[in-house]
């Protein structure tokens, strides 16, 4: 019988200044896949079902902590002031983990690509060792810290500048990710010294301290692509390309059809069902779900919305937060939908704005329809019943209700509720003036000619 895994605490380091980003925004809040970098790290760790989440903040702490309230309200934060190295940063979690009986895993808020499989492998290795580090074998070891192994035992981590010629030949390098018993880790961290050129306390000293204390340390390997950290704008650009490539491949493998995958942009939390079709140049912002069999046509932009099975969106559609598109509904070209429910089988085929509204089943919204939902201070709702027909160029001045099976005449401005089955006409009577257009043109031309002579 498989043993129950020990409780786990995630410690996410998000305190660095990120000076190479050349930005007023704290580095953990720069976006990748429409989500803050730190959100990627938390999402990877969430697959391990941690009992506690501790995020170490520092530079821009107020901003980082405010974002954490939205993306991870369960997180406990601890501030590192001043920033004195990675070991010092992890030690700031001691108070939050007081009395915690379980393991602690250290992750980084600027390293978004560690997979749940790799992190789970660390937990498995932890069952046989007191300290587990995560290593990788890069194509170019360069100036990475080296993992000095003796068989299965990790003796120490040596920085490149301090390594002997023999140690520099080692190709097994340090990613910085660590897993250990939480109490043991805090005990070892308390023994760190800052006897180095930077005057900082390094997490990389923990394996050697563990060995000195009679504990065992080891390291497991992951793919180099998982270890990428982001320290500059250029690295963020490369990371975005890597993220998008991975998401496209994963969705195609899961049964999503993409006609030009390199032109489609996904977010961290994009969910798409199999047999959905995504045409070229579609952008998915945060919080979008597309159900099986739906079709998203070219040049559409979606965020904060849900598209049900069989629905068709676009081309050139914009779905904003709160848009709910029902089964087999259609939202066509140059249509914007916000905070609105488009029910099953309804059609909004072109050139319309539908906001703060409900559109009933099988209703048909004509071209140029606008729900006039904002009075300059407050938003108001428009409710359109099932099987209603809204004529082209109708202005629906909210709050207003159009009943089931009702119709509005083209060009109408609707300011009052329309009963079920009624036809509403809200436009001025047309009056034709014979010959007046010819006279008006002649008069205007004479005025223009007179001005030209002046």
UniProtKB/Swiss-Prot annotation:
UDP-N-acetyl-alpha-D-glucosamine binds at residues 13-16, 27, 80, 85-86, 108-110, 145, 159, 174, 231, 320, 338, 353, 364. Its cofactor is Mg(2+). The keyword Cell cycle does not apply. Disulfide bonds: none annotated. Mg(2+) binds at residues 110, 231. Its main location: cytoplasm. Homotrimer. Catalyzes the last two sequential reactions in the de novo biosynthetic pathway for UDP-N-acetylglucosamine (UDP-GlcNAc). The C-terminal domain catalyzes the transfer of acetyl group from acetyl coenzyme A to glucosamine-1-phosphate (GlcN-1-P) to produce N-acetylglucosamine-1-phosphate (GlcNAc-1-P), which is converted into UDP-GlcNAc by the transfer of uridine 5-monophosphate (from uridine 5-triphosphate), a reaction catalyzed by the N-terminal domain. In the N-terminal section; belongs to the N-acetylglucosamine-1-phosphate uridyltransferase family. In the C-terminal section; belongs to the transferase hexapeptide repeat family. This is Bifunctional protein GlmU. It comes from Jannaschia sp. (strain CCS1). The gene is glmU.
